[in-house]
Amino acid sequence: MSNKNALADTIHVTKTAISSHPPETIKLAGNILQSCVDSKGIDLTVLDVAKVFGLSDYFIIVSGRSDRHVQGLVNRVINTMTAKGCPPIGVEGYENGHWVIVDFGDVVLHAFYEPIREVYDIEGLWAEAPRIDVKEPERFSERSLKAA
């Protein structure tokens, strides 16, 4: 799969077209998504919450198979993003690894232990936000979100 065609191969827009966001935000989201994939995160979803939330542009939602998997995934995302000069603004819920929220400003990562994600149904709570279903590809490009 070429990076130029990554969008067509990796995501499916299930609501209206994704609103336009700054390239830095799209790159940030792409880097977080790639880190989730590299950590074997499952059931990746991106919500474009800019018009319904106002404080962030994207929610990235990912699941792990255990609380330790969630913690490891979050560690990798934080370490990767910090190395790229984008440390998180805040982290909540890391201790138990059931629902960890990592705030990067324009992008917020919600990492869930699988059964807990079903209970909170964050996708249902933000149903008005355009949704991008990610097919968990081997690689993402910065264009993963932009070309939608």
Regions of interest found by a model, annotated:
Residues 44-55, 89-106:
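Glycine/charge-rich, flexible interdomain linkers and switch-proximal surface loops
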